[in-house]
Amino acid sequence: MTTEKIDNISVTTQANVYFDGKCISHGITLADGTKKSVGVILPASLTFNTGAAEIMECVAGACEYKLAGSDEWVQSSAGESFSVPGNSKFDIRVAAGFEAYHYICHFA
């Protein structure tokens, strides 16, 4: 199921801009103190490092991802999510000519 709306949040107004603008996100904090980020990845192939474990929820568009230690690219599209271990990394790619990948990153 795709998250369409998050109520009762505080938003960091200045965007986090990564990879020369290919990934842009905003941090949010829920009423209970839970932190997440919401963002978009434009067509590109990128590598992210994780501190805490993450769940990447796709709310629109699609991507392919590859977890550290794997050779397999897996597709993820709206309504789907994938988990990334903490202290790891993952590759993500959004194909040129396709809609940007819109996501919510849930930190564990």
UniProtKB/Swiss-Prot annotation:
InterPro entries listed in its UniProt record: Ppnp, RmlC-like_jellyroll, RmlC_Cupin_sf
GO cellular component terms given for this protein: cytosol
SUPFAM superfamilies in the record: RmlC-like cupins (SSF51182)
EC number of this enzyme: 2.4.2.1, 2.4.2.2
UniProt entry keywords in alphabetical sequence: Glycosyltransferase, Transferase
MF GO annotations: guanosine phosphorylase activity; purine-nucleoside phosphorylase activity; thymidine phosphorylase activity; uridine phosphorylase activity
Protein name (Swiss-Prot/TrEMBL): Pyrimidine/purine nucleoside phosphorylase
UniProt organism field: Polaromonas naphthalenivorans (strain CJ2)
Origin organism lineage: Bacteria, Pseudomonadati, Pseudomonadota, Betaproteobacteria, Burkholderiales
